[in-house]
Amino acid sequence: MITRLSELFVRTLRDDPADAEVPSHKLLIRAGYVRPVAPGVYSWLPLGLRVLRKIENIVREEMNAIGGQEILLPALLPRAPYETTNRWTEYGDSLFRLKDRRDNDMMLGPTHEELFALTVKGEYSSYKDFPVILYQVQTKYRDEARPRAGILRGREFVMKDSYSFDTSDDGLKAAYHAHRDAYQRIFGRLGLDYVIVAATSGAMGGSASEEFLAESPTGEDTFVRCVESGYAANVEAVITPAPPARPIEGLAEAVVHETGDTPTIATLVDWANSAGLGRTVTAADTLKNILLKVRQPGGDWELLAVGVPGDREVDDKRLGAALEPAEYELLGDADFAKYPFLVRGYIGPKALLANGVRYLVDPRVVEGTSWITGADEPGKHVVDLVAGRDFTADGTIEAAEVRDGDPSPDGAGQLVSARGIEIGHIFQLGRKYTDAFTVDVLGENGKPVRLTQGSYGIGVSRLVAVVAEQQHDELGLRWPSAVSPFDVHVVIANKDDAARAGAEELAAELDRLGHEVLLDDRTASPGVKFKDAELLGVPWIVVIGRGWADGTIELRNRFTGETQPIAVTDAVASVTQAIG
């Protein structure tokens, strides 16, 4: 069936939306693919829905190819299963919560590990039923604090989530790698540039976890990689290579110095290099201690101190990942007033440990390393405080920023950073959820076997924006043929009746051959039609213009910009060959 622009429910815009920040947000609205309804909530118009459905179909094909079976669970969920796993609390404010008329707590589902585990428990009881992979393509809901970038980070989004269930860890690993391969095929078919990185599991739980990140300067996720080895990881998952412990014997004794008004690392370093210490001091020789209060889900606030080398900032994402599922806040004025042993700007390990404050340090703070740090009195710091001799931390924490040039955890070279957009995440959950719901089946030996579970997600609606981010140009969208709303866009740029009739005939013949045709039969000017064709982004554009009288039309490649004249008599064959 030919789609006529004169009848299509679409309105293009010439100007970018005032609140749009990234190219995909601007272009998808300008081209009439989506429309905003509320912050983080969008309507899908016909063009956008066509692209979304094509991506969904690619995902379904590859999921079916690894033995996945599609089901559909409700988005409106009861509280009880999520209370059992504590995620009703762990998800905090990101959950959309509501009550029914009987005052029962309900929620809009952000993810479905619990429900899939319960579904399998209710249907299967023997090892003979496994392995099994179930999946759904469904709308999810998360109450993002700051929805942004259009459909890249919304509060309502379409996601493919699949779950594997096996009777052994080997089976889980096989399902995990099957999904990993399927995801690579999916993203390859979409023509995406992406990288697979080691990741943290967060509130999902489990052991092994990897993210698929589409490379983009507008991405919210920072990842690092080692060019020499191919190592790649989300910054939250980078493990700092700890230096070897150093001998303590013979090291200078710790001495407290009057340092004056030196509450910052910069002022402390200036003092140290003018104090006659006999060496040049840099920020890396200092140890700064950050005070937080942390609270486990359902628990009370507790103090936590984090010590990092003074040349490093604390990375909020790494800190949050290290503390998850606990929430945390920096101490404020009222908190410092409550704990007089905490002298802001001069906090050191001694007072922290003496007052029972949990103290975690960067992995670089190893036994035998010597530091300049606070002496717990105004205007005083201690020089040559040695880890393992003068203080012993309660443990380590991966909270310091990761920088370009840092050594790769695999020892093969240096790290370089880039930005990306998360498009997929795979987890080996293990038995976190099957333990919670006692999902056992009868094993081959007649004894109960606890199932092991994997979880695998793809942001389907987000992929629409990601393709737009990677493939657009200054003129508009450029859709790969696999997901383009149409195969070819036929533009009638000649008012001659014969030319219009020829365009109709060409469109009809292409349609008969099974191609999806968008025909611009509007009475608008050629300039308006050309701009819209470039904005809408169909990969092949056929222009029926002034050359019609000479027996030629134009075939334009939206990706390369190349235009070639083709004979009217060969038009169907030439366009079909180009479309492939």
Swiss-Prot record:
EC code(s) of this entry: 6.1.1.15
Superkingdom to which the source organism belongs: Bacteria
Catalytic activities: tRNA(Pro) + L-proline + ATP = L-prolyl-tRNA(Pro) + AMP + diphosphate
Cell location: Cytoplasm
Main location: cytoplasm
Keywords annotated in UniProt: Aminoacyl-tRNA synthetase, ATP-binding, Cytoplasm, Ligase, Nucleotide-binding, Protein biosynthesis
GO molecular function, one term: proline-tRNA ligase activity
A GO cellular component entry from the record: cytosol
UniProt keyword Nucleotide-binding present: yes
Top EC class for this record: ligase
Cysteines joined through disulfide linkages: none
GO biological process: prolyl-tRNA aminoacylation
Functional summary from the UniProt entry: Catalyzes the attachment of proline to tRNA(Pro) in a two-step reaction: proline is first activated by ATP to form Pro-AMP and then transferred to the acceptor end of tRNA(Pro). As ProRS can inadvertently accommodate and process non-cognate amino acids such as alanine and cysteine, to avoid such errors it has two additional distinct editing activities against alanine. One activity is designated as 'pretransfer' editing and involves the tRNA(Pro)-independent hydrolysis of activated Ala-AMP.
Recorded family membership: Belongs to the class-II aminoacyl-tRNA synthetase family. ProS type 1 subfamily.
Record note on domains: Consists of three domains: the N-terminal catalytic domain, the editing domain and the C-terminal anticodon-binding domain.
Subunit comment: Homodimer.
NCBIfam families (UniProt xref): PRK09194.1, proS_fam_II
PANTHER family assigned to the protein according to its UniProt record, in alphabetical order: MITOCHONDRIAL RIBOSOME PROTEIN L39/PROLYL-TRNA LIGASE FAMILY MEMBER, PROLINE--TRNA LIGASE
Protein name: Proline--tRNA ligase
Classification lineage: Bacteria, Bacillati, Actinomycetota, Actinomycetes, Mycobacteriales
